[in-house]
Amino acid sequence: KRIHEYKRQLLNVLHVVTRYLAILENPRADWVPRTVIFAGKAASSYHSAKSIIRLIHDVGLVINHDARIGDKLKVVFIPNYGVSVAEVIMPGADLSEQISTAGTEASGTGNMKLALNGALTIGTDDGANIEIREAVGDDNIFIFGLKTPEVRALRLSGYQPMHYYESNPALKAVLNALSEGRFSPEEPGRYRSLVESLPYGGDHYLLLADYASYVATQLRVDSLYRQPVAWSEKAIANVAGM
């Protein structure tokens, strides 16, 4: 898929870093191992999207080489995404991340292909996620975040992303780690403008507003994955429903 701000791959990165920091804080906890796979292309002149791709690489480089993490968390970016790559990724995926801001996504088919191959979807109530939810049932999909009318209402009321930054310690720690160069020590300011565009720059796609719901829903994913029979039942329901 495309790497684009509205698709919010950056929100996925925020969760990855949240998970990384949490593992470091409590390494003896019974963590569900997670390999997070990114794949996609950005328009050649789309600076923010290119910066997100580079950030994914840098975050992966730090996490994948941190001996304290071991196999609890890995981050991979697969280049040159296309049909041939998708044919490998989609059958092997457990979880499909479809996390665009509600009201921005057209009804695509990538998420449907993943569901047809047995991946459970974590996503917003947007685009074809709505059709998948209707096809497989509310209990067989992980929906989080603001819905389209709520997005509209929040913007009209005067969205204040700094409120979310200041009121959520985990979110604040993640944004500070990225902004201060923890994942780009050779160039500490590399991602400062990208990250600071969220609390200070208006956060047009409402990443900070949906962050807490997204992280909480990822914990629900972990909880279900600890129950292989229940997970398999939901995966089968997705295949059958699609």
State what each model feature region is.
Residues Y6, A240-G241:
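A short structural micro-motif
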Residues I37-G40, D94, T148:
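C-terminal, helix-dominated tail/subdomain
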Residues K1-E87, T101:
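Long, K/E/R/D-enriched contiguous segments that form extended
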Residues P91-G92, I99-A240:
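Catalytic binding pocket for nucleotide-activated donors in carbohydrate/polymer assembly enzymes
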Residues R34-V36, L95, T121:
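Hydrophobic beta-strand segments of well-ordered beta-sheets in folded domains
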